[in-house]
């Protein structure tokens, strides 16, 4: 296995955080404008968060499906142009009142109301390629649409709260779906629109030399079509409940650790058929994205396993994962997949060996570096085969950290290390430092480019509510920002065609 990334840079910007008129960022003209911004500043990557459906809590890392796209990102303007919506279908529907934040409660009902109107017209006038789409994706699409149809008929309850005969996919669930064809068609339609709109947007980005870094969560949600339709993939008991769930151990941030609640895979069963489910999942992700950030990479070496009945994550223990043989098997089937290893958190020699032997670039977070020691995260300790960030979606913004939780000692070290100039925002100094680093790739967060505080933080791990809501305001990107980002890119040779090192003659 070998490294694949060139010396370049990009921006982390969730699709949900784009501006736009329909309550949440999506695949409309604002997304195309964002691609144009990246291209004008000579960026090479647009990193996004998972595009899959979200469930309770609105987290893209807790989805009803590992494969289905999020209907919230469907652009209504395209549906108007195609004749499936009229402007009057949208006018008067409440989708939230604050353009800087997503109101998930509002869009849950409002966008569904609008898409229901589109579905009525769609039923009478399906696109010519709709049946081809269904046939090409039936392995995951049909189970997903059945799962969502039954879920809606059961009042949106978690599937283990459904009537007993519906808790596994079979004849009873098939009858429910046969009795409600309009619901089935609705979910097929939204996946069709999602696929076609995303494919066009990605092609537009690729044509401008912008590659998409997608995000692949390691786990699926307990309330997911995978647990319902393919329970054999997981460690479950006779009643269909998880034997154990995922989390993280106690650390300096939490005395009880993090209780994620995701079901644990039956890795032995997966290995017995050559990890075919994962092969399909990675193959699909590579169709959707150009590069994959593989979340919780250390979980493939060893994962924190918590007994299902435990009150918190402190009752868990480490269990060996499939290790390097998993990635070797993928390589045999897929070639060398372009994967970024999210190798943050508790690292052991085993995790480091697995990452290094895989050849995947790891991640460096500058915000973690300033502890008064020769930290692993200080840029002079980086290697080329890494991706450098000031912070990610799980961190405070740079300004929020520096003005808030950073200690005086951390602030002093950060200012000195980054050579912060008089009057220079600390966000610029930190961004400039990762741009100058030896890491092949550096990724800026959009909030840090805009010098925003923690009001723009995307997610605070182990908390509920107030996450995943930030949106960039229309017009926030200025010529000054474009010039600054271009200057960093050119100064530190992060344009792939110009990045080759010239040796002395």
Locate each region found by the language model.
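Conserved, well-ordered alpha-helix/loop/beta-strand core segments that scaffold catalytic motifs
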Residues: 187, 191-220
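Structured C-terminal cap/extension of enzyme domains
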Residues: 451-505
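Alpha-amylase-like alpha-glycosidases and glucanotransferases acting on alpha-linked glucans and related
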Residues: 2-7, 14, 58-195, 220-443, ...
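Catalytic domains of carbohydrate-active enzymes, especially glycoside hydrolases
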Residues: 4, 29-54, 287-289
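Aromatic/hydrophobic pocket-lining residues that form π-stacking "cages" and hydrophobic walls in ligand
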Residues: 34, 201, 351
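Surface-exposed amphipathic alpha-helices with a cationic face
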Residues: 39, 198-208, 331, 355-356
